[in-house]
């Protein structure tokens, strides 16, 4: 990308960190703690915008599970993180928060949270520490790549804004020459908070291998919204719990019906299990119905495998067990229990506690006729296939997969093609589910990049 020339001589700095999220702030902490003059640039008006968003509903800092299990959460990069996490894992993250005056607790799921559940107090304390170490923040400065002379090129996101430390700038452009640069630009999700993936073509133009950014920890659109029995008839009576008794019916409408959307979009599915046979995934948890499909923590846990399945095959099928605590035989027994004058819905609520979204999805996928065929209904309750056809757009995702390939950087994330330039955080090619794994890895990579930058400056 050819950049215009800035209207003044380039500003000289020792270290430029681009991105004021957790990865950039951690790199700044390492460097400033060693006495290095650090300048942090970000396009947003204030630091940690996505970090604060992550704290809505409770900031999940890390996870308490053993490191050998923890590292497996990083899918294809589990071997890489098995060597990274011993230096910065849950223990170090909890101790670091304590140093900032933030006490933590371990929830019933093993996730670690601040005691007050909030992100803002931790971020304020962190920023105060960095300012005390003379880190300078330059907000509303959008990096647009390198100019023809190799300087970092910035455009003011608000050309009339005052920019701390560089200029009370009324000019829209700024060139910065840094001895060392740490890029912590995020991935491709939540563009309005700064992670727009605009950096991808600029790095590729410099010969850096960057895997395409893809949605991770995302929702999915449903495809076929009606099922038929495997025998194409409701006359047969399959064995209780026969998982092959239902399959998607081609040619029916796709997506939820308007009735389902109006009644159940935003409603939770609690205490259900999902099986994705293609990836040998089976787990119990929660998710919610959306106007286009499904999302939530249990969906996020299998989202990488579902995305891969869809990319390879055009769709992915998950199987829901709506009553994982109950055997197929017991379910069939309760379905067959005489209901007298009660409606089927009242009967299922009374005997099986099936109501709300769980009952709604059965009517949606089976239809009224099949709902009154007890064997088919019982089989569906225990093994309900749902076809997913697409991920939701990357900008809706919690995080993204893809990024700078790990074989394009050294052990401290220095770009092999551009010495003195380091990468950190979500812009690297890795992904993980929610549960504290994302933030832990973002901070761990920022710490390593900061250490690498320090070694580079001292070499």
Predicted regions and their residues:
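Residue-level detector of alpha-helix initiation sites
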Residues: 17, 21-22, 46, 187-189, ...
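Short beta-strand to alpha-helix junction loop
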Residues: 81-89, 108-128, 190-195, 221-225, ...
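Predominantly flavin-linked oxidoreductase catalytic cores and closely associated redox partners
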Residues: 121, 129-350
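A conserved FAD-binding loop/helix module that cradles the flavin
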Residues: 189-202, 206, 429-458
């Amino acid at each position: 990308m050819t950049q215009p020339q800035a209207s003044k001589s380039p500003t000289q700095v020792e270290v430029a960190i681009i991105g004021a999220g957790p990865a950039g702030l951690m790199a700044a902490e390492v460097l400033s703690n060693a006495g290095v003059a650090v300048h942090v640039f970000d396009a947003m008006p204030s630091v940690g915008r996505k970090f604060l968003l992550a704290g809505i509903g409770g900031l999940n800092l890390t996870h308490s599970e053993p490191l050998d299990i923890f590292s497996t959460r990083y899918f294809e990069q589990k071997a890489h993180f098995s060597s990274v996490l011993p230096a910065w894992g849950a223990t170090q993250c909890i101790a670091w928060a304590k140093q900032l005056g933030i006490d933590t607790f371990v929830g019933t799921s093993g996730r670690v949270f601040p005691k007050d559940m909030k992100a803002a107090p931790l971020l304020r304390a962190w920023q105060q520490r960095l300012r005390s170490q003379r880190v300078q923040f330059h907000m509303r400065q959008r990096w647009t790549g390198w100019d023809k002379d190799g300087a970092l090129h910035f455009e003011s996101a608000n050309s009339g804004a005052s920019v701390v430390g560089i200029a009370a700038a009324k000019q829209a452009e700024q060139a910065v020459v840094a001895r060392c640069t740490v890029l912590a630009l995020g991935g491709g999700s939540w563009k309005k908070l700064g992670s727009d993936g605009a950096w991808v073509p600029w790095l590729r133009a410099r010969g850096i291998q960057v895997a395409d950014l893809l949605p991770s920890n995302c929702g999915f659109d449903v495809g076929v919204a009606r099922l038929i029995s495997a025998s194409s008839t409701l006359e047969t009576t399959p064995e209780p719990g026969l998982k092959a008794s239902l399959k998607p019916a081609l040619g029916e409408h796709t997506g939820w019906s308007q009735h389902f959307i109006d009644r159940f979009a935003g409603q939770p599915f609690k205490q259900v299990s999902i099986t994705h046979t293609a990836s040998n995934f089976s787990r119990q948890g929660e998710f919610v119905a959306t106007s286009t499909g499904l999302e939530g923590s249990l969906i996020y846990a299998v989202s990488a495998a579902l995305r891969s399945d869809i990319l390879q095959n055009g769709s992915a099928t998950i199987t829901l067990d709506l009553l994982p605590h109950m055997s197929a035989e017991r379910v069939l027994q309760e379905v067959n229990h005489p209901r007298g004058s009660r409606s089927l819905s009242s009967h299922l609520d009374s005997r099986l506690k099936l109501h709300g979204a769980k009952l709604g999805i059965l009517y949606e996928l089976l239809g009224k006729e099949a709902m009154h065929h007890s064997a088919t209904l019982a089989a569906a309750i225990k093994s309900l296939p749902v076809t997913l056809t697409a991920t939701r757009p990357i900008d809706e995702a919690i995080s993204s997969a893809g990024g700078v390939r790990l074989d394009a950087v050294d052990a401290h994330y220095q770009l092999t093609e551009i010495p003195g330039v380091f990468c950190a955080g979500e812009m690297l090619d890795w992904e993980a589910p929610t549960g504290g794994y994302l933030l832990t890895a973002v901070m761990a990579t920022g710490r390593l990049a900061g250490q690498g930058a320090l070694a580079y400056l001292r070499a």
